[in-house]
Structures are given as C-alpha cells and as structure tokens.
Amino acid sequence: MSAGAYEGVLREIIHAFKYEGRRSLADPLGGMLRDASSVVLDRCNCVVPVPLHPWKRMRRGFNQARDLAKRLERPMVDALWRLRATPPQLALNANARHSNVQGAFVVSPFLIRRARLHGGRRPFIEDRTIVLVDDVRTTGATLDECAKMLLAAGAREVRALTVAMAEKSR
C-alpha cells in the first residue's frame, strides 16, 4: 500500500527528504503514511524499516525508511540487515532490479541470538504480522526480497507500506 503517486510535489518532497537531508520532512511524510494505512497498521505487531547498507547510511546520515517507520506509532524492530551494497536501482528494469537485490538482506543475527539467549524464545518476528516500511515502491523488488527473508524467519504475514508508488508499479 502506498499513500500517493510518486509524481509532482510528493516526488519533490521525497527527493528533498532523502537526498537533501531535509529530515524534518519525515513528520509530514510519516503522518501521511500513517493516515493512509491505519487499517494495515491496526493489524500489525510491528513495523520493520527497509535497511540501507551501512556505507550508504553513513554517507546519507540517516535511513529514510527508519525515520518514516518511527512516525507510525507502532513498535519498530530493526529486523533486517543489508549485507551488501547494491548498485542504484534507478536505471534498472524490473528483472535487473530483482537480481540486484537478491541475497542482499538477512534477518538480524542479533535478533535471533537474543531469542536464543533468553531461554530459546522465538525471535520477535516469528508468528507476527509485520509491516515493511520504505519511501518509494517502484517494481517492488526490494520489498519482495525483504518480505522473503522475514517470512523465511517465521513471520506469519508481511505487508508493505510506502509513501509513494512509482508509475512502474501501478
């Protein structure tokens, strides 16, 4: 589910937020996402932001998906790690995008280890309804790969929320 189309003013706002470091825009964008997806959020146990590779996060200074997820007023779990930096998806077609992110994500080993240390309890994501959060959905390749990892780790259901959906996805 997306709150709007990735065009016009919304596209400009997301660009300013993501690439110009205008983190104050997380509040209105997160509010827009929260308002548009209240039914989905009411049925979830937690939200999981799509992770950035550590080098990209260092360069940008923040993870835009995490900033958005914080504003959804639901428990947030950093359940995923991005293992490898992937080339930018911008110029890739749908098939290349899926290949580009294949194997790029794993469930956080800390999450699994913490569960084992506490009497073998299941990881927090097991048997839960999870909402993945990202800024823009284009082909869905990144969200699909993240969902695949969460489901393999035992999530009951994974839904995806984005602020905007690019025309290629509609």
Give the location of each predicted region:
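Conserved PRPP/pyrophosphate-binding segment of the phosphoribosyltransferase/PRPP-pathway fold
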Residues: 1-133, 139-170
